[in-house]
From Swiss-Prot:
Its cofactor is Zn(2+); Co(2+); Ni(2+). It comes from Bacillus cereus (strain ATCC 14579 / DSM 31 / CCUG 7414 / JCM 2152 / NBRC 15305 / NCIMB 9373 / NCTC 2599 / NRRL B-3711). This is Peptidoglycan-N-acetylglucosamine deacetylase BC_1974. Keywords: Cell membrane, Cobalt, Hydrolase, Membrane, Metal-binding, Nickel, Transmembrane, Transmembrane helix, Zinc. The chain crosses the membrane at residues 10-30. Inhibited by the hydroxamate N-hydroxy-4-(naphthalene-1-yl)benzamide (NHNB).
Length: 273
């Protein structure tokens, strides 16, 4: 009888320990900062989920009594092996674009950086690492942009000011980092249209290009649009001819970013940058 009682007591203790352990694990899974950050990082990877941004730009200039419509094609993450083809297409259509470059690719493809600038496109910075934790949690955004800027300046002979935040400026580019951006003399551009070009890597290029073009053309409704694309994907470059044609039919012209006529395009609506 006494032996049976001891066994019951041991079982009760073991159950209690297990319950405490399970409760602690569940609490950690909910409140752990590491898990919260990981969840946050997974969210910001999806550029398409960033908020819509209204551009704080004055009324566009008019030509022959008509309001001008301007599309700013922007390409992130390059240069890469498809960039030369993209530049050929832009040249054929007499269209200018804006490129946001990764430091490692600047080093690998200096001739493409030089060509982008020589053909009238704007060359800006997209960081060295494209790493959320380093750029935002560790506060290295401005330092990485300065390093990237230096690499570009060594090739094109001038230091660009415009940056494109990897994953978009929200939520990573907090007020403290934005203050540093302003102090460093940099500007920030997010986008008004996400082409979602990165989403179609596993589709046939032609089908993917058609979908990307549709994404852009469907959403191009305002006098100025800043369009997010990436020149490291074949489907992105393949989509450009249809995008150019479709936007022209909707009355758009194509311009590169100009520092002297900067206007804010950021998810924070921070007019300083």
């Amino acid at each position: 009888m006494e032996k049976a009682l001891k066994i019951k007591q041991i079982v009760v203790v073991l159950i209690a320990i297990a319950a405490v352990a399970i409760g602690y694990y569940m609490f950690q899974s909910i409140t752990s900062p590491a898990k919260a950050v990981a969840k946050q990082e997974n969210v910001v990877q999806l550029a398409s989920e960033q908020p819509k941004v209204e551009m704080n730009k004055t009324a566009p200039s008019r030509f022959n009594g008509k309001e001008r419509k301007v599309a700013y094609l922007t390409f992130d993450d390059g240069p890469g092996k498809y960039t030369a083809e993209l530049l050929n297409t832009l040249k054929q259509h007499d269209a200018k674009a804006t490129f946001f470059l990764i430091g490692a690719n600047v080093k690998e493809f200096p001739d493409l950086v030089k060509r982008e600038n020589a053909e009238g496109h704007y060359v800006g910075m997209h960081s060295m690492t494209h790493n959320f934790a380093k750029l935002y949690k560790n506060g290295e955004y401005v330092n990485e942009m300065k390093e990237d800027q230096g690499l570009i300046a060594n090739i094109i002979g001038k230091s660009p000011k415009l940056t494109r935040p990897p994953y978009g400026s929200m939520p990573g580019l907090n007020e403290g980092l934005r203050n540093k951006v302003v102090e460093g003399g940099f500007k920030v551009w997010d986008w008004t249209i996400d082409s979602l070009d990165w989403r179609y890597n596993k589709m046939p290029v032609d089908a993917a290009a058609a979908q990307i073009a549709q994404n852009v053309l469907t959403n191009a409704t305002k006098p100025q649009e800043v369009i997010l694309m990436h020149d490291i994907h074949p489907q992105s470059v393949a989509a450009v001819p249809a995008i150019l044609k479709g936007l022209k039919e909707k009355g758009y012209e194509f311009e590169a970013y100009h520092e002297e006529s900067h206007f804010p395009v950021n998810f924070w609506h921070d007019n300083r940058m």
